[in-house]
């Protein structure tokens, strides 16, 4: 009898791994939407790849592996297996990050193509999107193993340019998410203020708006102090001054009477969030300048703690402050992509999500939740609540962005010091300008396209 019960339990677990609902994950949680759970699991796969990349890039890991005679074969070449030995030089360092992120990007790009034009959970492909997690994990592992057998050759050089484009686009997506977050925040607090007839909510909005602007001003002052010199660093001075001017312009545009008439919820809170994010991107760009006198984050030859002996003798610019902050923002934005449900029409249009996902009435929804307690329930029978394909494309871009972040935008073959290049500087600065234009468009679009509904 015990064996029968055990077999039944294993069959139940197998059905969860191979079926259309991630019930193992949700068995200890309240009933949740299938669409949300699926996005969270895909995001977990991405975070798993990021964790492996960080481990491979960590100082000391290679030296520890070299102590195991059955693991590593001395030498620096392409990833090969010789008599059961593995070349650790190809497994660790920036090349490992490139290959790991190639595997995750290829994994999500496959699902980007597979999930094109899925309109509801009745589509057979929706079952693949929301289930078969064990097989998906095996596919990801297989792609990862295969990626380490790609010969070096021109792979890393070509993949670097894919990373540049993908990171540029993901920076824009991060800004779109911030616009959405700030808009939702402003709208909710204004609604609370009207419901409760309390000025405390207005005071809260004023406090955070002022805080974000003060932080932005402090950032400008610190960047001028540490990333410029009176007689040099002209590029940094121009970048800081231009972005400060552009942020002032969009802040003024956000409170213009005509903009307020067209979008009553537009205000300085959103502008302050965008301004602070722009200052962060500017800071990140300045920290990528490959000139010692204009960039205090560059490693020096005098025992700077950021210098790490990487695989094959490369010196790694390891975990400076902009990289850490950028990685935190990346994690938060990726989670936000998985959990978000926007009420901003223009953001939904940009992010390929629906403004009002299909909903049941209150009684039907309570019955569905009660029936599905302890597992995910299908909330997309009448229509998907987000674009499956675009979600996976965002994760492709996220994989490329984290690849560039972890490797400090290092261009293979350019130098044996893994430091950023001018390419990184210009990509980040151009992304900040494009982001400001994108935010400005969300402000003026209702004025320019009067025949469209932006309410």
Curated annotation (Swiss-Prot):
One of its GO terms (cellular component) is membrane. The chain crosses the membrane at residues 5-27, 40-57, 96-118, 131-150, 160-182, 202-224, 239-256, 268-290, 317-339, 385-407, 422-444. Keywords: Cell membrane, Membrane, Transmembrane, Transmembrane helix. Pfam families: Serinc. The keyword Ribonucleoprotein does not apply. InterPro entries: TDE1/TMS. It is found in: Cell membrane. This is Serine incorporator 2. The keyword Hydrolase does not apply. One of its GO terms (molecular function) is phospholipid scramblase activity. Belongs to the TDE1 family. It is a multi-pass membrane protein. Signal peptide: none annotated. Non-ATP-dependent, non-specific lipid transporter for phosphatidylserine, phosphatidylcholine, and phosphatidylethanolamine. Functions as a scramblase that flips lipids in both directions across the membrane. In contrast to SERINC3 and SERINC5, has no effect on HIV-1 particles infectivity. GO terms for biological process: phosphatidylserine metabolic process; plasma membrane phospholipid scrambling. It catalyses: a 1,2-diacyl-sn-glycero-3-phospho-L-serine(in) = a 1,2-diacyl-sn-glycero-3-phospho-L-serine(out); a 1,2-diacyl-sn-glycero-3-phosphocholine(in) = a 1,2-diacyl-sn-glycero-3-phosphocholine(out); a 1,2-diacyl-sn-glycero-3-phosphoethanolamine(in) = a 1,2-diacyl-sn-glycero-3-phosphoethanolamine(out).
